[in-house]
Amino acid sequence: MGTVIAYDCLKRVPDCPKIDGLLTIGSPLGLEEIQQKMTPEWTRANGFPSDKLSGSWINVYDALDPVAGFDPKISNDYLKTLLPVIEDIHEPNFGMWRHDITKYLAGQKLRTRLRGLLDL
């Protein structure tokens, strides 16, 4: 639920500092049950937290992740003035428990995007 808390802060906490980039990993933010709890601040048409996020939002998921897998792609749920701006990256994990940060961090796609976000 860390990504839900981070998003909630970006949208609802006035004193939340601005950030240059956001990386969500195995996030349940695509689930309608989560989105319903974020209204009225969240809308599909303008869900991107552009007041607090000045750079990229990269969402990494595994389709078999039990937390994110039911709706892992969030670029269509958090638009910026009706346009998709989030980059959804499918990073296949392995093993029985796919919602494991060590498995995500072992993925080449995630590491490549993270280096880009950090300007390394």
What are these regions (language model features)?
Residues 3-120:
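Lipid deacylating catalytic domains
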